[in-house]
């Protein structure tokens, strides 16, 4: 049975107007699980960027990759305007996809 591919560009944020991470994947649900469970070390886990604030689905991976590159070249202000246009409260859209809400961010020193 062939694996279903759903090319997607997504933006994760550490919080409202926080650090942003832009990625591309063929399986958004799997990739979100990896980010949220620390299964992939790197920028997103280092900066605790787990909240899905924007995503766009594509018919093919080539278009998704082109869009990812475009967004990565945008100024931060443009990215914020894109998010605010569709998700002004910066809600975690992953909750609407079936993920549990993330615990509120605390300080790293435990206080």
Regions found by a protein language model. Name each.
Residues 1-41, 45-51, 55, 62-69, ...:
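GIY-YIG nuclease catalytic motif and its immediate N-terminal context
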């Amino acid at each position: 049975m062939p694996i279903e591919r759903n090319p997607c560009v997504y933006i994760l944020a550490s919080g409202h107007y926080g650090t942003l991470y832009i990625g591309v994947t063929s399986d958004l649900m799997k990739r979100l699980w990896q980010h949220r469970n620390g299964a992939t070390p790197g920028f997103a886990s280092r900066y605790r960027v787990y909240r899905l604030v924007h995503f766009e689905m594509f018919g093919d991976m080539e278009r998704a990759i082109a869009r990812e590159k475009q967004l990565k070249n945008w100024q931060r202000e443009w990215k914020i305007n894109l998010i605010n246009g569709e998700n002004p409260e910066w809600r975690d859209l992953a909750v609407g996809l079936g993920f549990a809400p993330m615990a509120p961010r605390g300080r790293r020193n435990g206080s």
